[in-house]
Amino acid sequence: MSSDLDRQIEQLKRCEIIKESEVRALCSKAREILLEEGNVQRVDSPVTICGDIHGQFYDLKELFKVGGDCPQTNYLFMGDFVDRGFYSVETFLLLLALKVRYPDRITLIRGNHESRQITQVYGFYEECVRKYGSVTVWKYCTEIFDYLSLSALVDGKIFCVHGGLSPSINTLDQIRAIDRKQEVPHEGPMCDLMWSDPEDIPGWNGSPRGAGFLFGEDVVQKFNHDNNLEFICRAHQLVMEGFKYMFNETLVTVWSAPNYCYRCGNVAAILQLDENLKKNFAIFEAAPQESRGAPAKKPAPEYFL
């Protein structure tokens, strides 16, 4: 299997899709591995933590240039692999293939875009249909989304989650008790982990996103104290500098999609933690235009002419 898998990884690294039958086999293997992982997946340092990628495949390649290749570097990706960029299929399948090949060297947690509903609106569904001619690959991938961990805990000290905290979660054990194998709900603790944002407010507030909550410094202090955490690491929000500390460095946002949507002009960052949890933010820019090949924004095939 690993020689097949290595060939598929090489193919995906060239931004070439693999066969539908190979996607099916890959997803089936990934499912077995992800089933064994917890809602709060344990990760050991040293580790490199990454934020949203959003189908920006050539920028993911830049990320690996800066951070090192997997398995030499131990990676944790905090979700939102798909949607908005042109290469969600290649991006997600490459990360999934690396997960199956090196399960202990790459951790993938779920973002709010790892959802059937959201991907039908923001591009992944349409891209799967365009590249494979049917919805089958989208179905295989969205089924895998249901098995992804909800969060990760580095050395018992650093809590990593896509979005943020929830008013219905006080302890990590309450996250461990969630049944995660489902579509992202519209409300409740699982939804909040993927949708919430930190804000300079006291306590909790409704979120303008229409899902999740806004939460303030006091909430973070209490959560970190009660769970013996040093800080919270999350993604979910574009930050122009690639990373942003809040609340006296008890929370950091990491954003890993440079020049987001190919027009925002932001840089991206990854957070490198050494074995003593010393932090280094590596900043990178979007891949140069000439390394990208032609953009894949072909019009959808006109089946009904």
Swiss-Prot record:
<keyword id="KW-0539">Nucleus</keyword>
<dbReference type="GO" id="GO:0005737">
    <property type="term" value="C:cytoplasm"/>
</dbReference>
<feature type="binding site">
    <location>
        <position position="236"/>
    </location>
    <ligand>
        <name>Mn(2+) 2</name>
    </ligand>
</feature>
<dbReference type="GO" id="GO:0050920">
    <property type="term" value="P:regulation of chemotaxis"/>
</dbReference>
<dbReference type="InterPro" id="IPR006186">
    <property type="entry name" value="Ser/Thr-sp_prot-phosphatase"/>
</dbReference>
<feature type="binding site">
    <location>
        <position position="162"/>
    </location>
    <ligand>
        <name>Mn(2+) 2</name>
    </ligand>
</feature>
<dbReference type="GO" id="GO:0030289">
    <property type="term" value="C:protein phosphatase 4 complex"/>
</dbReference>
<keyword id="KW-0963">Cytoplasm</keyword>
<dbReference type="Pfam" id="PF00149">
    <property type="entry name" value="Metallophos"/>
</dbReference>
<dbReference type="GO" id="GO:0031156">
    <property type="term" value="P:regulation of sorocarp development"/>
</dbReference>
<feature type="binding site">
    <location>
        <position position="112"/>
    </location>
    <ligand>
        <name>Mn(2+) 2</name>
    </ligand>
</feature>
<dbReference type="GO" id="GO:0005634">
    <property type="term" value="C:nucleus"/>
</dbReference>
<keyword id="KW-0378">Hydrolase</keyword>
<keyword id="KW-0479">Metal-binding</keyword>
<dbReference type="InterPro" id="IPR047129">
    <property type="entry name" value="PPA2-like"/>
</dbReference>
<comment type="similarity">
    <text>Belongs to the PPP phosphatase family. PP-4 (PP-X) subfamily.</text>
</comment>
<comment type="function">
    <text>Required for development, chemotaxis and the expression of numerous genes.</text>
</comment>
<dbReference type="GO" id="GO:0046872">
    <property type="term" value="F:metal ion binding"/>
</dbReference>
<comment type="subunit">
    <text>Serine/threonine-protein phosphatase 4 (PP4) occurs in different assemblies of the catalytic and one or more regulatory subunits. Probably part of a PP4 complex containing ppp4c and ppp4r2. Interacts with smkA.</text>
</comment>
<feature type="binding site">
    <location>
        <position position="52"/>
    </location>
    <ligand>
        <name>Mn(2+) 1</name>
    </ligand>
</feature>
<feature type="binding site">
    <location>
        <position position="54"/>
    </location>
    <ligand>
        <name>Mn(2+) 1</name>
    </ligand>
</feature>
<dbReference type="InterPro" id="IPR004843">
    <property type="entry name" value="Calcineurin-like_PHP_ApaH"/>
</dbReference>
<feature type="active site" description="Proton donor">
    <location>
        <position position="113"/>
    </location>
</feature>
<dbReference type="InterPro" id="IPR029052">
    <property type="entry name" value="Metallo-depent_PP-like"/>
</dbReference>
<keyword id="KW-0904">Protein phosphatase</keyword>
<keyword id="KW-0464">Manganese</keyword>
<feature type="binding site">
    <location>
        <position position="80"/>
    </location>
    <ligand>
        <name>Mn(2+) 1</name>
    </ligand>
</feature>
<dbReference type="GO" id="GO:0000724">
    <property type="term" value="P:double-strand break repair via homologous recombination"/>
</dbReference>
<protein>
    <recommendedName>
        <fullName>Serine/threonine-protein phosphatase 4 catalytic subunit</fullName>
        <ecNumber>3.1.3.16</ecNumber>
    </recommendedName>
</protein>
<dbReference type="GO" id="GO:0004722">
    <property type="term" value="F:protein serine/threonine phosphatase activity"/>
</dbReference>
<feature type="binding site">
    <location>
        <position position="80"/>
    </location>
    <ligand>
        <name>Mn(2+) 2</name>
    </ligand>
</feature>
